[in-house]
Amino acid sequence: MEHPLHHMDFIFQTKLGTYPLEVQCEMLAETGYQGLTVSAWSKELSALSRVKPQWGLDIGAIYMIYRPGLESFVTNIVQSVEGTQRIELALHSGESVKDADKRMLERLLPICEQRGIDIALYPHVRYGMQTTSEAISLCEEFDHPNLGIVFNGYHWYANQEKGLEQRLDAVMPWLRQVNLAGTRLSPLGWGGVATIEPLDEGEMDNFVLLGALARRGYHGRYGVMGWESMGGDVYGNLQRSQAAFRSMEKRLAAHPDWSVMTPSSY
């Protein structure tokens, strides 16, 4: 099966500025994507309801970061956003998950329940909630149907969590979305940890990740990451990642056993 393929809008935020939403959508539609994830700091959130009827693209989620001082900003978006049913939420109140993060979730979840919106916790390297284990603990503590997790291959790899099969088994009850990137551990990467690259680059074996998810029955969408530091032509990078993903997907369907690796430290 072909999974819906989305791209995060970070790829459109370059050193020279940000491509308008209309251009983002035209590029994504032309290069074969089914949707996008929009960052909460976009100046065009009010236009999201036009995206599906005009370009046929789904808004998979709004990506948002909570840190102390952003309570009103985060709450207002959850209360008012149209055109999507998901918030991907990174938590960064300190060096680990703090009471402030939990209070934020306590405030947001009733609103989400009323509006039919999910929160997908977004483990993020060098943030307070870095690991899948921390996200799972929050899901277990809150035990709320509108709370789940994004499994992000990039952040799992950058954090060097290891134990891919075990981490996926642990996350599956709450899995809402999977995000991917080409990446390699490098002090030149994001946060001095790891690069963000098109899917046909890097040392992270995304084919193995796709296979592990397929064996667990994952049928949801995939999101591709981007970042201004990846360089190159934005349109060309979109093409490369889309082609690499569909190639891996097709290969996996024909040869599912190819994705089963001899166990290593990961």
Regions found by a protein language model. Name each.
Residues 53-66, 112, 141-142, 205-209:
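Alpha-helix-loop-beta-strand connector modules within alpha/beta enzyme cores
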Residues 67-149:
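Active-site acidic/histidine proton-transfer and metal-coordination neighborhood
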Residues 4-20, 62-70, 91-98, 198:
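Active-site mouth loops of central-metabolism enzymes
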Residues 40-42, 65-68, 91-95, 125-127, ...:
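Active-site-proximal loop/turn and secondary-structure-junction residues that shape catalytic pockets
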Residues 41-51, 96-105:
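Active-site-adjacent beta->alpha loops and helix N-cap segments on the catalytic face
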Residues 37-39, 61-63, 86-89, 120, ...:
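Conserved beta-strand positions in the central sheet of alpha/beta enzyme cores
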Residues 20-44, 82-87:
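Catalytic domains of carbohydrate-active enzymes, especially glycoside hydrolases
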Residues 1-9, 18-29, 107-110, 132-147, ...:
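Histidine-acidic metal/acid-base catalytic patches
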